[in-house]
C-alpha cells in the first residue's frame, strides 16, 4: 500500500491504512506500507521494478498522477483510492466529491444562504492537482453559480491551527459569509475554536457542512450535517478489486464511485438577518 509521503497522516488517512490492513488480513494477505512522492521516489521505484509485492493500492491521487502512469507501464496490478482525470481502463474506488459538495451547496441555498465559502485542502495539494480538492472546487463553484450565490474558495493546511487562522481570515475578508462547506477534517478543531472565539452560534448565526467522516462529524459541536467518507467500505472494495486483478489478470477493469447520503445533524439552519 502506498500512502502519501507526509510527516503526519490525518485521522482519515490512518483509517484508510488500518482498514486496508484489516481487509487484506481477511484474505490472508500481508500489507507493506511504503510512501511515495518527494524523497520517496526511489522506494516506490524499488517496489515497481523489484516486484516485491503482488499488487499496489495507491492513496491521495492527483488528477495527473505519474505513479499511476508508472504502474500502468510496469504491468503491476494496482488500485487507486481516488482517480485520475482520465482513468480510462483502470481500477479505482472514490467518493463523488464534486457531486456531494454540490449537494451541500444546494442544501445551504435551500436554507436561504447567499454568501458561502469552501474551506478546501492546502495550497500545496491544490497546486499539485489533488483530485478531491479540485473536484470539490468544481462542484462548489458550479452549484453556487446555478443558485446565484456569492462564493469563495480558500485553501487551508491540514491542522487545527490552520483551521483557526483560515476561518478568522474568512471573517475578516468576507464578513457577509453565513455558511461554509469543507472537506478538510483535520482543520475542523481550529474552525470550531474560531467559531467560539467569534461568538457565532451554530447553526443560528453560521452554518457548516461538507464531506467529513461520520465519526468526526459526530464529534463536532454541534454535530455536523455532512456526507461520510466511508474509509472501511472503500478500503474493502480496493482490496477486493486488487485481489480480483491478481487472481485474473485478464479481468475487465472495474471501479466504484460512492455517493454517501448527506446526514442531517445540527450544524445547518436557515439564514438569519
What is the meaning of each model-derived region?
Residues 29-30, 77, 114, 150, ...:
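Residue-level detector of anion-binding/catalytic polar loops
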Residues 19-23, 70, 135-147, 169, ...:
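Alpha-helical structural signal in soluble globular domains
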Residues 173-273:
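Flexible loop/turn connectors
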Residues 4-13, 35-40, 93-103, 119-166, ...:
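Hinge/beta->alpha junction and helix N-cap segments in small-molecule ligand-binding domains
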Residues 53-59, 117-119, 153-154, 174-184, ...:
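Periplasmic-binding protein-like
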Residues 1-106:
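Alpha-helical recognition/docking segments in bacterial nutrient-uptake
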Residues 50, 111-113, 170-176:
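Glycine-rich phosphate-binding loop signature in dinucleotide/nucleotide-binding domains
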Amino acid at each position: 500500500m502506498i500512502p502519501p509521503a507526509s510527516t503526519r497522516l490525518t485521522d482519515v488517512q490512518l483509517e484508510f491504512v488500518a482498514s486496508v490492513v484489516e481487509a487484506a488480513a481477511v484474505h490472508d494477505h500481508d500489507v507493506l506500507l511504503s510512501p511515495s512522492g518527494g524523497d520517496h521516489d526511489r522506494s516506490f521505484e524499488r517496489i515497481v521494478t523489484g516486484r516485491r509485492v503482488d499488487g499496489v493500492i495507491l492513496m491521495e491521487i492527483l488528477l495527473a498522477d505519474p505513479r499511476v502512469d508508472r504502474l500502468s507501464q510496469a504491468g503491476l496490478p494496482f488500485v487507486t483510492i481516488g482517480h485520475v482525470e482520465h482513468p480510462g481502463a483502470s481500477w479505482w474506488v472514490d467518493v463523488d466529491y464534486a457531486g456531494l459538495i454540490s449537494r451541500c451547496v444546494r442544501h445551504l441555498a435551500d436554507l436561504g444562504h447567499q454568501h458561502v465559502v469552501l474551506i478546501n485542502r492546502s495550497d500545496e495539494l491544490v497546486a499539485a492537482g489533488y483530485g478531491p480538492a479540485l473536484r470539490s472546487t468544481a462542484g462548489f463553484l458550479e452549484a453556487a453559480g446555478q443558485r446565484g450565490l456569492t462564493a469563495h474558495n480558500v485553501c487551508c493546511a491540514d491542522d487545527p491551527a490552520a483551521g483557526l487562522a483560515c476561518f478568522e481570515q474568512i471573517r475578516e475578508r468576507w464578513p457577509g459569509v453565513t455558511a461554509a462547506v469543507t472537506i478538510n477534517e483535520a482543520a475542523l478543531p481550529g474552525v470550531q475554536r474560531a467559531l467560539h472565539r467569534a461568538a457565532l452560534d451554530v447553526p443560528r448565526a453560521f452554518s457548516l457542512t461538507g464531506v467529513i467522516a461520520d465519526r468526526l462529524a459526530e464529534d463536532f459541536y454541534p454535530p455536523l450535517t455532512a456526507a461520510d467518507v466511508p474509509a472501511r467500505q472503500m478500503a474493502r472494495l480496493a482490496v477486493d478489486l486488487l485481489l480480483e486483478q491478481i487472481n485474473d489478470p485478464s479481468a475487465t477493469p472495474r471501479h466504484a464511485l460512492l455517493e454517501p447520503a448527506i446526514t442531517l445533524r445540527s450544524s445547518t439552519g436557515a439564514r438569519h438577518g
